C-alpha cells in the first residue's frame, strides 16, 4: 500500500487516499500528529533498539561501526535496552521533562539532516534516528489497516538548508531514503512539500487558478507558484503547472528560538555585565536556545562552556541570574526553554498577552510576553520568510490570484498580517494547517500507484489494462528480476531500472533489458 508521509520538522503524519479522498491515520493517543521528538536512555540505545528488537539491517560499514560502538557502550554502562526504551512524540517529551539529565532527547531531527560538515558517524546516527521514527510510524499505520505499508511518497522541502545548496539537499534526501528503506518501505518517492499542500487545496477549486502556496513548517519555509484547477487534477505530467518556487531553512522553530532568546534569556542574565561594568558575552545565551544548530549545542554543552559559565557567575553583577543559565547547562534544559517560548507563541495567536513560567529553573521565575514583543522578536526570521515569497514570484512572470497559507505557523496573526501587507491585493486562503501536506502527498501517492502500472521499455509503452495486468514493477535492482508480460510470449531479464526525480512531473521508469525467450 502507498501512503503519503509527512516527516516534518515539528510533527509527523501519514495518510492514505482512496478515490481521491485522503484520510489521515492516527499516530498517538488518537491524534493524527506525532510530534517529531524521540528519547532513549542513551544516544547509543537507538542503534541497539533497531537491531535487537526490530532486526533492522545496517547495510553500510559506517552503520555497522555505529552499531558495534553502541552495543559495546551500552554493555559497559550496564544499560539494558528493552523494547520500550525508545519513546516518541509527547511520551518522549514527558520522559525528558521528568528527568532531563537522565534522558537523551532530540526534537526535530529533520532540521539537522542538511547541515554542512556532518561527519560520516553523525550521518549514520541521524539515519538511525529517522529510521526509528519511520519504523514506529509505519507500525502505527499498519495497526489501522488490513495490509502492510511498503510504499511511501515522502515530503521534502525545496531546500533543507540555507547553505550548501544541492549538496545539502542530496545529503538530507539520502538520509531520508536510506532510513525509509531500512524501516521497511521498499518503494519510496519524494514530492516537494508546498506542491503537496497545493494538491490538497486544488481539490476545492472549480476553475484554473494561479496559486502561491506558502508552507511555513517547523524547520523550513517553502513557496511554490502553481497553476491549479479541475483540468490539472488527474494529470500525470504537471511540470507545466509549476511556475516558480523557492525555499529556505527558516520556520516555526526559528520563531520559537528567537522568542526564547529575546524574551526569556534576559531572565537568565542576557544583557548583563560584570562587576567592572563589562558586558557579558551573548554567545552562550544564544547557543543555549539554538536547538536546531548542532555546532551551537555542542559548544554550549561542552566542558569549556561550563567553566565559562561558572566564571561568569563569579564575575557578574547579578550572579543569581547567570546561575540560572548554568542550571540550564547542568540539567540540559535547552528544549524546555524553547518549548516555553513555543507555548507563548501559540497562546499569542488568540490573546494579546500571555505568561511564561520558568519554574523548572527557579520557583517564581516567569515573565509576561505581548503580541508586540512577539512581532519584534521574530522580525528577522519573518523578513527571511517574506524574502522567499518574493523570490518565488520573481521566478515567474505572473501574479498569484490567491495565496494558500499552510503549515504549523500559518495560524500566527503576525505572519498572516505580514504576508497580507506584502501582497495587499491578493486574498489569503487557509486549509488544514497541519494536515494539508500529508493529504496532498497521499493524493500524489494514489496517482503514482496508477502510474507505476505504466512502463516505458525502449520506446514501447505497455499499459496496465486487462491484457497486461500481470506486470509487476519492482524498484529493487540489486538482483536481476524476471518480468512477464501476459499478452506477449516473452520473458525479459531486467538489467537496470532508471528513474529521474521530477519536481512535479510524470513518473518515468525506463528499463534496460534483454529478451530471454
Please state what every model-predicted region is.
Residues 1-118, 251-281, 286-289:
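Early-domain small/polar-rich strand-loop-helix modules and first-structured segments
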Residues 1-22, 96-213, 234, 321-340, ...:
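Nucleotide/phosphate-binding catalytic cleft detector across ATP-hydrolyzing
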Residues 5-11, 157, 213-222, 226, ...:
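A short acidic Gly-Thr/Ser loop motif
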Residues 35-40, 47, 228-360:
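Phosphate-binding glycine-rich/basic clefts of nucleotide- and phosphate-handling proteins
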Residues 176, 209-224, 405-408, 415, ...:
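Extended, hydrophobic alpha-helical segments in both membrane/secreted and soluble proteins
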Residues 183-191, 417-443:
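Conserved phosphate-binding/catalytic loops in two-lobed NTP-binding clefts
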Residues 453-464, 474, 478, 496-499:
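N-terminal amphipathic/hydrophobic targeting modules at extreme N-termini
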Residues 481, 501-503, 507:
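Cationic, low-complexity basic patches in intrinsically disordered or flexible, solvent-exposed regions
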Amino acid at each position: 500500500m502507498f501512503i503519503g508521509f509527512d516527516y516534518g520538522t515539528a510533527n509527523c503524519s501519514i495518510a492514505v487516499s482512496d478515490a481521491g479522498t485522503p484520510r489521515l491515520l492516527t499516530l498517538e493517543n488518537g491524534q493524527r500528529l506525532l510530534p517529531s521528538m524521540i528519547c532513549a536512555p542513551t544516544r547509543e540505545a537507538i542503534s541497539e533498539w533497531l537491531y535487537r528488537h526490530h532486526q533492522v539491517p545496517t547495510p553500510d560499514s559506517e552503520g555497522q561501526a555505529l552499531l558495534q560502538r553502541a552495543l559495546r557502550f551500552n554493555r559497559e554502562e550496564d544499560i539494558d535496552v528493552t523494547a520500550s526504551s525508545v519513546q516518541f512524540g509527547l511520551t518522549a517529551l514527558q520522559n525528558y521533562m521528568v528527568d532531563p539529565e537522565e534522558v537523551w532527547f532530540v526534537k526535530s531531527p529533520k532540521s539537522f539532516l542538511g547541515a554542512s560538515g556532518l561527519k560520516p558517524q553523525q550521518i549514520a546516527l541521524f539515519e538511525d534516528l529517522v529510521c526509528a521514527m519511520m519504523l514506529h510510524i509505519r507500525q502505527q499505520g499498519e495497526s489501522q489497516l488490513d495490509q502492510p505499508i511498503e510504499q511511501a511518497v515522502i515530503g521534502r522541502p525545496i531546500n533543507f538548508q540555507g547553505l550548501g545548496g544541492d549538496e545539502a539537499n542530496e545529503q538530507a534526501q539520502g538520509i531520508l531514503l536510506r532510513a525509509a528503506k531500512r524501516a521497511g518501505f521498499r518503494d519510496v518517492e519524494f514530492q516537494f512539500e508546498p506542491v503537496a499542500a497545493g494538491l490538497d487545496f486544488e481539490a476545492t477549486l472549480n476553475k484554473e487558478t494561479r496559486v502561491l502556496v506558502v508552507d511555513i513548517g517547523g524547520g523550513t519555509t517553502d513557496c511554490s507558484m502553481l497553476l491549479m484547477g479541475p483540468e490539472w487534477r488527474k494529470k500525470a505530467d504537471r511540470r507545466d503547472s509549476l511556475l516558480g518556487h523557492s525555499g529556505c531553512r527558516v520556520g516555526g522553530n526559528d520563531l520559537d528560538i528567537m522568542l526564547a532568546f529575546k524574551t526569556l534569556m534576559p531572565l537568565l542574565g542576557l544583557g548583563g555585565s560584570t562587576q567592572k561594568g563589562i558586558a557579558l558575552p551573548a554567545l552562550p545565551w544564544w547557543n543555549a536556545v539554538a536547538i536546531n544548530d548542532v555546532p551551537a549545542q555542542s559548544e554550549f554543552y561542552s566542558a569549556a562552556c561550563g567553566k565559562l559559565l561558572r566564571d561568569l557567575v563569579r564575575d557578574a553583577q547579578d550572579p543569581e541570574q547567570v546561575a540560572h543559565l548554568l542550571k540550564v547547562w547542568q540539567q540540559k534544559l535547552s528544549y524546555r526553554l524553547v518549548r516555553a517560548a513555543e507555548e507563548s507563541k501559540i497562546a499569542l495567536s488568540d490573546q494579546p498577552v500571555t505568561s511564561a513560567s520558568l519554574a523548572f529553573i527557579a520557583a517564581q521565575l516567569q515573565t509576561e510576553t505581548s503580541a508586540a514583543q512577539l512581532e519584534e522578536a521574530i522580525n528577522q526570521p519573518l523578513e527571511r520568510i517574506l524574502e522567499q515569497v518574493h523570490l518565488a514570484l520573481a521566478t515567474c512572470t505572473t501574479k498569484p490570484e490567491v495565496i494558500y497559507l499552510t503549515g504549523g505557523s500559518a495560524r500566527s496573526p503576525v505572519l498572516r498580517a505580514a504576508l497580507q501587507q506584502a501582497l495587499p491585493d491578493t486574498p489569503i486562503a487557509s486549509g488544514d494547517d497541519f494536515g494539508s501536506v500529508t493529504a496532498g502527498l497521499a493524493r500524489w501517492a494514489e496517482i503514482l500507484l496508477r502510474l507505476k502500472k505504466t512502463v516505458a521499455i525502449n520506446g514501447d509503452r505497455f499499459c496496465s489494462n486487462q491484457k497486461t495486468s500481470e506486470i509487476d514493477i519492482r524498484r529493487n535492482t540489486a538482483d536481476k528480476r524476471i518480468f512477464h508480460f501476459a499478452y506477449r510470449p516473452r520473458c525479459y531479464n531486467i538489467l537496470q531500472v532508471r528513474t529521474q526525480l521530477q519536481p512535479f512531473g510524470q513518473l518515468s521508469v525506463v528499463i534496460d533489458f534483454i529478451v530471454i525467450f
